[in-house]
């Protein structure tokens, strides 16, 4: 989508158009420095404003390690959704609606770094294990709904045990980063449960341009300074499944991903 008109046309064709999808949708972006809802005329909710300010402060802190995230927030090439509960089935339809809009709109940002941030108001996961279960439960429901309309992105695998796995929604592959208050790692410890969706193709573009390795090295150096050790789940795409990295919880060899794609 390269023009505002084309983006609006895609938004009008959004297949996630049920009453529940509209009720739970919360697609927000900055316009003139003000947070606004972009799929309807309602104002951004108070929680959306608070979550947006908190997330910007979290990522733009000098110690935060992910340089791509910093770039996206500085350039305002991100969208933010504010929802009730991560493990609420009703939220899934609104999240699907907003992710479809983001997949359609992100190409118009003309930036190497774009991201969709889904923040959930209810803090009900007292452990990393509880958050991980809620994360995969929501991704499973999201996929089950999305599979009615879209095939899995053919550039990646739908098998979470495959080193080529990446989560797909609206026909687009995403690397998902989970954040929550109970995270053991500082870089994953945020005030509310949060899922960050980063388009897989932007990493592939960085590789094609020869910039990925240098950026990765800088990020890992910053992570080492912040945490004292790298996340044991870290691996390069194509060597091990990225599914292990989504929740941020260290996983052992016996870990099994609960996600199963429809075929």
PLM region spans:
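Short acidic, S/G/P-rich loop/turn micro-motifs used as interaction or catalytic elements
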Residues: 123-127, 182-183
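Aromatic/basic-lined ligand-recognition segments
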Residues: 154-191
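Compact mixed alphabeta submodule
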Residues: 180-221
